[in-house]
A protein has these predicted regions:
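Conserved nucleotide-sugar donor-binding subdomain of glycosyltransferases
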Residues: 76-124, 129, 172-200
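Extended catalytic core of nucleotide-activated donor transferases of GT-like folds
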Residues: 11-13, 25-28, 51, 65-74, ...
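Residues in the short beta-alpha loop(s) of Rossmann-like NAD(P)-binding domains
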Residues: 47-49, 140, 212
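Helix-loop-beta element that forms the nucleotide-linked donor phosphate-binding surface
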Residues: 130-131, 201-202, 207-209, 214-216
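Active-site proximal beta-strand in glycosyltransferases
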Residues: 7, 130-175
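Structural motif
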Residues: 6, 114-115, 133, 205
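N-terminal subdomain of nucleotide-sugar transferases
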Residues: 1-66, 109-110
Length: 216
């Protein structure tokens, strides 16, 4: 396949080094797309703690680091999009940054990718409005995972993600208060169910790890 074919991969973390289960999957996913299928691979990713862009493997042709939203932006996103308007789950609101979208817009203009992939539900909001062939790689349905955990033991659920650790201890305790957390999780499940179906309809393809996730 000619290297003129391009894929833009939008990710919530770097796909390297292959030090965890998801990173290992992403690493080989990218390697196969580049080395075996011959695509020029452009990656736009946020950084997680410990990520080092200097370790970029050769099969990634271009890497752009996306700026995470500030705490103020996250709070605004949650209040307006998840609580008041109820149009986005917190999984999406916590990763939405207009500055990151501008970078992705520039990448699309410069590279004109044939395919754009959004990794996990938190990245798919960035790819929904392009003319390229769009793939939502959701891995699993978080709404189902949360529902199973809610039915079994809510103590294992943190709907706020790493954002919780950026807040004062007193606020953390309030947000983890069981009645409040049950309400938040139930609302998040409802928003995720709607969003997962909506993004699946808007993208050209949707990928799940297990067939039963797609069947439900």
């Amino acid at each position: 396949m000619s290297r003129s074919k391009k894929i833009l991969f939008v990710m919530p973390r770097l796909p390297f080094p292959a030090t965890s289960g998801r990173k290992t999957s992403l690493y080989h996913y990218c390697r196969i797309l580049s080395e075996e299928l011959g695509y020029k691979l452009i990656v736009a990713a946020f950084l997680e703690k410990g990520d080092d862009p200097n370790l970029k493997p050769k099969f990634i042709d271009r890497l752009e680091i996306l700026p995470k939203p500030t705490s103020v932006t996250k709070i605004k996103n949650i209040l307006f999009d998840s609580v008041l308007l109820k149009r986005k789950p917190m999984q999406v609101s916590l990763y939405w940054n207009p500055e990151a979208k501008k970078i992705i817009d520039t990448l699309v203009d410069e590279e004109n990718p044939d395919i754009i992939i959004g990794d996990m539900v938190r990245s798919t909001e960035y790819i929904r409005d392009y003319n390229a062939f769009r793939v939502a790689d959701l891995d699993d349905r978080i709404s189902l995972r949360y529902q199973r955990q809610l039915d079994y033991d809510i103590t294992g659920i943190n709907p706020y993600g790493a954002f919780l650790n950026t807040l004062p201890k007193m606020i953390q305790k309030i947000m983890l208060w069981k009645p409040l957390k049950v309400y938040v999780v139930k609302n998040e499940i409802k928003l995720l169910r709607h969003y997962e179906l909506e993004i699946s309809e808007q993208c050209d393809k949707t990928i799940f790890v297990a067939q039963q996730e797609a069947d439900i």
